[in-house]
């Protein structure tokens, strides 16, 4: 009798995706982040579901309902902080996952990569709307500033902003619709992640060498299931440490003040994972230019396959490209730091230089360096 997992219509899909999947024998721990992102999404959906049971999306009671969750609901504080810090873990895994893709040339799987970029945008949109829900000062002013950026779009800008707000300012209508979207988007993300996986399994995984691994495949289970479990345990340990020892480490103290449209906080800034894009936005003095740069800073990832000029897929054997890659990482960390600083000298000029370097590295310097490496290898 044939094994049920190989014949049953549903079990067969699971079997071919997580059990008998032929996997390269040499993929490193940088390939763990896909499964970690899946775990993060599950944690976020579950904690979010329990939070939604107690949260009210009304401007008068939203802040109080979050306080009520933390004070009166059984382990409500734990659920709330797991959800808030779970988002940070989600983005850490996302950035490492994208960085891995850029380093090892995984972007040459075009469909998988493009859906991945779409997923990145969806997660960023979800996180932004989630940050608005507690209705603290930074929630309100963050929502006001970021949605206001759309007014830079010529002709339809101001109408579009009022349409998103549902009125003439960020108010009850905005909060209600943000809650609705914040609830539905994670399920869309889960569906997209399924499609992401579907396209990945059409080609099979890439590996650190960037060379075809068809001649040397091993089954996913037990080799990579056990490896993923180690990654998951480390993720849970980090998240638990963050939640139980310093849950507000990555948050903003201003968000413990209820939203007040009449009082602007001295420094409006988003959560840490958006700071790099926020720094790029602020480094351009023109509103429309800043908005374009903000969108392009992430949309530029779509161009990665077109900007690949190297004859080798991976950066594993390309020392100059490796060097530039780590300069890009350092540049992004610099932008993240600048995004959290006030708009004054010397932070303005540092942000502008870092922004120019970011786009120059991706669009010009790295492709030219790859061509140079081809020449050096007489290819």
From Swiss-Prot:
Required co-factors: heme b
Gene Ontology biological-process annotations: mitochondrial electron transport, ubiquinol to cytochrome c
Residues engaged in binding a ubiquinone: 201
The keyword DNA-binding belongs to this UniProt entry's keyword annotation: no
Cofactor, how bound (note): Binds 2 heme b groups non-covalently.
Cellular component annotations (GO), alphabetically ordered: mitochondrial inner membrane; respiratory chain complex III
Binding-site positions, heme b b562: 83, 182
Membrane topology term: Multi-pass membrane protein
Keyword Coiled coil set for record: no
Positions bound to heme b b566: 97, 196
Keyword list, A-Z: Electron transport, Heme, Iron, Membrane, Metal-binding, Mitochondrion, Mitochondrion inner membrane, Respiratory chain, Transmembrane, Transmembrane helix, Transport, Ubiquinone
One term of GO molecular function: metal ion binding
Subcellular location: Mitochondrion inner membrane
Residue spans crossing the bilayer: 33-53, 77-98, 113-133, 178-198, 226-246, 288-308, 320-340, 347-367
Highest taxon above the source species: Eukaryota
Disulphide-bridged cysteine pairs: none
Pfam families: Cytochrom_B_C (PF00032), Cytochrome_B (PF00033)
Alphabetical list of InterPro entries matching this protein: Cyt_b/b6_C (IPR005798), Cyt_b/b6_C_sf (IPR036150), Cyt_b/b6_N (IPR005797), Cytb/b6-like_sf (IPR027387), Cytochrome_b (IPR030689), Cytochrome_b_C_euk/bac (IPR048260), Cytochrome_b_N_euk/bac (IPR048259), Di-haem_cyt_TM (IPR016174)
Family statement: Belongs to the cytochrome b family.
Subunit structure: The cytochrome bc1 complex contains 11 subunits: 3 respiratory subunits (MT-CYB, CYC1 and UQCRFS1), 2 core proteins (UQCRC1 and UQCRC2) and 6 low-molecular weight proteins (UQCRH/QCR6, UQCRB/QCR7, UQCRQ/QCR8, UQCR10/QCR9, UQCR11/QCR10 and a cleavage product of UQCRFS1). This cytochrome bc1 complex then forms a dimer.
Additional free-text comment from the UniProt record: Heme 1 (or BL or b562) is low-potential and absorbs at about 562 nm, and heme 2 (or BH or b566) is high-potential and absorbs at about 566 nm.
Function text: Component of the ubiquinol-cytochrome c reductase complex (complex III or cytochrome b-c1 complex) that is part of the mitochondrial respiratory chain. The b-c1 complex mediates electron transfer from ubiquinol to cytochrome c. Contributes to the generation of a proton gradient across the mitochondrial membrane that is then used for ATP synthesis.
Name recorded for this polypeptide: Cytochrome b
Originating species: Notiosorex cockrumi (Cockrum's desert shrew)
Gene: MT-CYB
């Amino acid at each position: 009798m044939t094994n049920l997992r190989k014949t049953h219509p549903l079990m067969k899909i699971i079997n071919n995706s997580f059990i008998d999947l032929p996997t390269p024998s040499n993929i490193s721990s940088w390939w763990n982040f896909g499964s970690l992102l899946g775990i993060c999404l599950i944690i976020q959906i579950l904690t979010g579901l329990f939070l939604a049971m107690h949260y009210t999306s009304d401007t008068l009671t939203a802040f109080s309902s979050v306080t009520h969750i933390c004070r009166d609901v059984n382990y409500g504080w734990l659920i709330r902080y797991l959800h808030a810090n779970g988002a940070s873990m989600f983005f850490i895994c996302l950035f490492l996952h994208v960085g891995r893709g850029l380093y090892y040339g995984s972007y040459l799987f075009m469909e998988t990569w493009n859906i991945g970029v779409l997923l990145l945008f969806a997660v960023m949109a979800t996180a932004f709307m989630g940050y608005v829900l507690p209705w603290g000062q930074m929630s309100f002013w963050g929502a006001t500033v970021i949605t206001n950026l759309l007014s830079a779009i010529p002709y339809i800008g101001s109408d579009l902003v009022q349409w998103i707000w549902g009125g003439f300012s960020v108010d009850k209508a905005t909060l209600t619709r943000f809650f609705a979207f914040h609830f539905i988007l994670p399920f869309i993300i889960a569906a997209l992640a399924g499609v992401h996986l579907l396209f990945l399994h059409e080609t099979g995984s890439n590996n650190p060498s960037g060379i075809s691994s068809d001649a040397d495949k091993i089954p996913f289970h037990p080799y990579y299931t056990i490896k993923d479990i180690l990654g998951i345990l480390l993720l849970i340990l980090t998240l638990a440490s963050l939640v139980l020892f310093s849950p507000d480490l990555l948050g903003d103290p201003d968000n413990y003040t209820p939203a007040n449209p009449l009082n602007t906080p001295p420094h409006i800034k988003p959560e840490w994972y958006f700071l790099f894009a926020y720094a790029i936005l602020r480094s351009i003095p023109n509103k429309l230019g800043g908005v374009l740069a903000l969108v392009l800073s992430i949309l530029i990832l779509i161009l990665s396959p077109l900007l690949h000029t190297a004859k080798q897929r991976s950066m594993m054997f390309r020392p100059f490209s490796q060097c530039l890659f780590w300069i890009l990482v350092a540049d992004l960390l610099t932008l993240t730091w600048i995004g959290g600083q006030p708009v004054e000298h010397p932070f303005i000029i540092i942000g502008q230089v870092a922004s120019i370097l970011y786009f120059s590295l991706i669009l010009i310097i790295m492709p030219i360096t790859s061509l140079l490496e081809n020449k050096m290898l007489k290819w």
